[in-house]
Design a protein with these regions (language model features):
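Single-stranded nucleic acid-binding surfaces, predominantly the OB-fold ssDNA-binding core
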Residues: 1-118
Length: 118
């Protein structure tokens, strides 16, 4: 019975984390209309065979203290278009629809995978 009582008194969360290795891109500061400015980036995660690597892009808000420190440290290298590979952990991923505003796909719908870089 004590386990049931303990479970009732504790907050429960379902955590979804993605861990891997990928390229760090598009380091930027985002200024929303409401709320505070935050650091963001794109991670192109590598997956599949090393002979035929595929990539999945994640658009991330940089949340973790260590992630903030590391991304800020690597920001100049990303801006200089150097290849920057990182180990990462992304939490709370979700899809977000958007409309392409320019290029060959202008007006088409797309999907971005959002998350928090820890």
């Amino acid at each position: 019975m004590s386990n049931k009582a303990e479970a009732t008194n504790q907050s429960s969360f379902f955590n979804l984390h993605v861990e891997g290795v990928g390229y760090l891109n598009r380091v930027r500061r985002v200024k929303p209309k409401k709320g505070q400015e935050f650091l963001a980036c794109t991670v192109s995660a590598m997956r599949g065979s090393t002979d035929d690597i595929a990539y999945t892009k994640f658009d991330c808000k940089v949340s973790g203290a260590e992630a903030q420190k590391i991304v800020k440290m690597l920001e100049a290298d990303v801006a200089a278009e150097k290849t920057v590979i990182i180990g990462f952990k992304i939490a709370d991923i979700y899809p977000e629809m958007f409309t392409f505003e320019k290029g060959d796909r202008k007006g088409e719908l797309g999907v971005s995978i959002k998350g928090r870089l820890l």
